[in-house]
Amino acid sequence: MAFSPVKSRAGANCQIIFTGDVFRCIGTRPRKGGAMGKIYFDNGSTSFPKAPGVGRAMAELLERGAFNINRGGYEGAYEMAGRVLDTREMLAKLFHAESSRQVIFTPGITWSLNMFLNGFLREGDHVVVSGMEHNGVMRPLEQLRKTKGISYDVARTSSEGEVTAEAVEKKIGPKTRLVLVLHASNVCGTVLPIEEIGEVCKRHDVFFAVDTAQSAGTLSIDMQKANIDFLGFTGHKGLKGPQGIGGFLISPELDACVRPVILGGTGSHSDLLSQPEELPDKYESGTMNLPGIIGLHAALSYLEETGIDVIRREKEQLTARFLDGVREIPGVRVIGKQTMEHRTAVVSLDFPEMDNAIAAFLLEQEYGIMTRVGLHCAPLAHQSLGTFPKGTVRFSFSEQNTEEEIVRGIEAVKRITENRNYL
C-alpha cells in the first residue's frame, strides 16, 4: 500500500492511497452532504439497511444461548436444530430445490465456490465461463490451472456485458465438465440468460453452476427449470441478511462427483474416521455460524412477506430514474446496457475527464453519496466492458432508497462534471 499526500485540483488537502485495485482519496475537508444525511448507493457490496428483525434476532440468540446443533442432548440444541432446518427449507423453496438437504451453509459465496471447484475439478478438466466473472471464480480457476492442469475458456462477451447461450455452446468441447457463470454482473448489472445456458449444458451433458451473488433476493431463480447443478449464494446482499453467512445448493448428480475439502466433526457418524457422505453433513464440518443463519432466517422471512417481485419492481423504478437522469449529462458515460432490459439495480459510470477515484471521493465528501470505485474484484468484466484498468464508479440501489435520494444522486453527478475546478 503506497501513500502519496497531494493537493487535489478541487483544492482539498488529501491523501491518495493505492491498494492495487483502486486509488482512494482521503480528504480532510468537512463533508457537506452530512447536513441532509448520507445516501448509501453501495448495495452491490452489501445491503444496507438489513431486513427488519435481522439484528434483533441475532442479538437475542447470542444473549439467550446460541446452542450448537447436532452436539447437545438438551432442549436448546434441539430448538436450534429446528430453526436451522427451517432456514434450509426457506432457501430450498426460494431456489426451487428438490430437497432442503441440498442446502449447504458456508461463510459466504467465495467460500462456496472454492469448496466446489477444488472438490470437483480434476486434471485435464475443461471449464467454460463468461467474460463477466468475479475473482471469486477466476482466482480459484487460475490456481487450479497452475496446480492441477485444468483449463478454461471465456465465452464471447459483448461490450454491454451480454453473453448468449450460443457463445457458451461454442466453447464446449470434449473435455468440458462444467459451465460456470454469474447470473447478474456486479459491475454493470447485466443479467445472463441462465435458463438458455442451462438448456445448452443439459444437451451436452455438462454440469452447470451459477453464481447468484448479485441476483438472489432480487430475481426469481428456479434450479430445476434452469438445469442448475450448483447454485452459490451469499446472505448479505440481495437476501438482506448479515455478513459471514452464505452457502450453496447442489444437485444429487453433481454431489456424487464432488469431494469435500473441509473435513472434521459433524455431530454425525462420530464413530467413523471418514467423512459422512450424506447431505448436508458431507460439506458442513465444524461449528456453524448460528447467529448468521438466524439472521438470514429473519431476512428470508421479510423477503417472503414482502415478495421478491415487489422488491425487484421498486429497485427497477429507482434504477430507471437514475439512468434517465445521468445518461444525458455531458462528461459521464454509462457503462454496459443503457436501458433496464435484462439488468439489475447496478449502474456503473465513467468520468472520462477526471479520475474516477476523485469522482467517487467528491460524491462522498461533497454530497454524502457512498458508492464503490475501481475494478470491483472483477478485472475480467472490466476488460470485456472496455473499462480496464481505470474501472468505474458503481451505484447499486436498494428498495430502501428513495426517489429523493435518486434525484440528489443525479444532481451530484451533474455538479461534479460541471465544476471545472474538479477537473
Task: Give residue ranges: language-model regions.
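Pyridoxal 5′-phosphate
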Residues: 13, 18-423
